[in-house]
Amino acid sequence: MPEIKRLPESVANQISAGEVVERPASVVKELVENSLDAGSNKILIEIENGGKDLIRVKDNGHGIPSDEIEIAFDRYATSKITDINDLYSLKSLGFRGEALASIASVSILDIISRTKSQTKAIKMRLKGGKVISKEPCGASVGTDIIVKDLFFNTPARYKYLKTTRNEFKHISNIITREALAYPGVNFTLIHNGRIVLKTPGTGKTLDCIYAIYGKEMAQSLVKIDYEDRYIKVSGYISRPDYYRYNRSYEIFFVNKRAVHNSILNRGVEEAYQGLLPPGAYPVVFLNLKLNPILVDVNVHPTKKEVKFSRDKVIKEVIQNGINIELSKLDKSPRLKRNINPLNRDDKTKDKSEYQKIKLPEDKEQITNKSSDAGILKNQNPLDSQDSILLPSKKNGFYSKKNSQVSQNKFMDINNKLEKTEINDNYKKDKHYKTDSINIKDNSIKENKNKMDIPIKRVLGQIKNTYIIAEGRDGLYIIDQHNAHERILYQSFIEKYNNSEIVSQPLVVPVNIETTAPEAEVLKSYLPQLEKMGFKLEVFGINSFIVREVPSLIKKRSNKRVVREVIDKLLEHDKAMKPSELINEIISYMSCRGAIKAGEYLDKKEAEQIIEGLFKTDNPYRCPHGRPIIIHITEDDINKGMGRK
């Protein structure tokens, strides 16, 4: 049996450091929090190669006395608590006394620190946790820590670090949250010699949001200041017409500490329930101020997760506070458009995807109900009314200006559709699975053996949403949005693989503001975006100018679509392969570009939809897997009528 031995201090420190120092961002977080606890109002963070080569944090805080600087690197040495009861009234960000010791044990660390009462600073170097040198030097009041060669003595841990871009993203997220929690502190983040984030330190949260996320977001927020019982909720929340398609913009602080807790997300999302499209999330920056005894920050090694003793009450307070602020916006046109995007007749519609992405109608469509509201002219550049593309035999797509066809009936039957038997493939559509397309390998190719069209003639529409058609064996109900989405999707995939996507220049270029990590991701995808029809140019530190977009995107939704495409890139950047991600974006754009529920089609347009649908590789499911066609057989009709 192996003999039980006490581990050497250096080994114990390296093992313990694994809980505190997971990656470069962990180092940045601990050092910045020490700077904040030291009363700093100016903090410089300098990073090289995502923090793998160098991390520097310099502040103007109160500094460390020269006779305490070595003790500061002993494990469990801290100035923030003295006994266990202090944990229940904790006001500092750090308290365990593990951070400096853990960081020093897995790196080469230099520290220069000076207090106000000292005439000279003290400079000390540590390697693997051991003091190598210590000497006086000249420096201003505050602390300057430089960490080099992180994990130099633990190569197994270094091997698991991600790419420079990924590691920098984590660092930027840390600094973003600390800056939002402390708007009175001037933060500067430099990566590879370039300033990527800088906050003004004015003490105003909205100024900080503007500096990090840009003007558009800052102007789309409303202030919240609510107190109930022992909890105060303050910060900013988004109007219902401004949202994102992931939760990464729901940012919470408890007593100015950035935290994660699902109860906070639920409180926010329940307050916005019914106000946002399906799959959309609000943008919130909320700080909860409550008695420290009601929150346990010691449940996670990195202190990013917390536990509440009154979680249900906290959720209710958040929800009530947001509800009150949103209710004040009831008379705002921006809010009304989001709460009631559909006409009165649309209330009974299925809660399907096309409602989520319904766009504002043109004035002509609203005022002239007898006109064709669906097919508009496609022009270049995008300075005309919105366009909807439909298939034609000649060139794959055609566009048409509003016609004067009455909605009460279709035009005379145009016998363009073939009267054929139902294809066996249709009978097997229940076994169909959602497309899995390898874009890089051009797996979508033209269907040489065109499917027979199992439909004789178009009869009409139901609620301007479903095409009703007669076939050789009963009735066919076709979802016009899903059908058009399938047509656009296959055309887009084929054109993408052949680099044939048509772009249209914007009369007024769209400015997109991003955070520093978003900018890094976006730059890496610029070639793929250009191939998809988006022409973006870097414009400033973390902003881009969109000069061209794919022709199928409607003019009035340009900025929204581009923003949502970027959100999808950021959300799935690491979760999907590049080909899968591009496929996801093309599916999304096809959905946004397709005819919507509630749009009137004349008979010819409905026929064109059906004809184009059966030229695709799979006319029975849209790219997201939703059904396109419902078949009611003649036998089913006869049975329902009591004839069988």
Curated annotation (Swiss-Prot):
The entry's protein name is DNA mismatch repair protein MutL
Family as reported in the entry's similarity comment:
Belongs to the DNA mismatch repair MutL/HexB family.
Q: What is the lineage of its organism?
A: Bacteria, Bacillati, Bacillota, Clostridia, Halanaerobiales
- One GO process term, biological-process aspect: mismatch repair
HAMAP family found in the cross-reference section:
DNA_mis_repair
Q: Please give the Pfam families that the UniProt record associates with this protein.
A: DNA_mis_repair, HATPase_c_3, MutL_C
Q: Which GO terms describe its cellular component?
A: mismatch repair complex
Region (Disordered), start-end ranges:
336-356
Function, as annotated: This protein is involved in the repair of mismatches in DNA. It is required for dam-dependent methyl-directed DNA mismatch repair. May act as a 'molecular matchmaker', a protein that promotes the formation of a stable complex between two or more DNA-binding proteins in an ATP-dependent manner without itself being part of a final effector complex.
Annotated keywords: DNA damage, DNA repair
The leader peptide range reads: none
Fetch the InterPro entries from UniProt.
DNA_mismatch_repair_CS, DNA_mismatch_repair_MutL, DNA_mismatch_S5_2-like, HATPase_C_sf, MutL/Mlh/PMS, MutL/Mlh/Pms-like, MutL_C, MutL_C_dimsub
**The keyword Signal is assigned to this record:** no
**What GO molecular function annotations does the UniProt record carry, in alphabetical order?**
ATP binding; ATP hydrolysis activity; ATP-dependent DNA damage sensor activity; mismatched DNA binding
Write out the biased-composition intervals (Basic and acidic residues): 343-356
UniProt superkingdom: Bacteria
Q: Which organism's genome codes for this protein?
A: Halothermothrix orenii (strain H 168 / OCM 544 / DSM 9562)
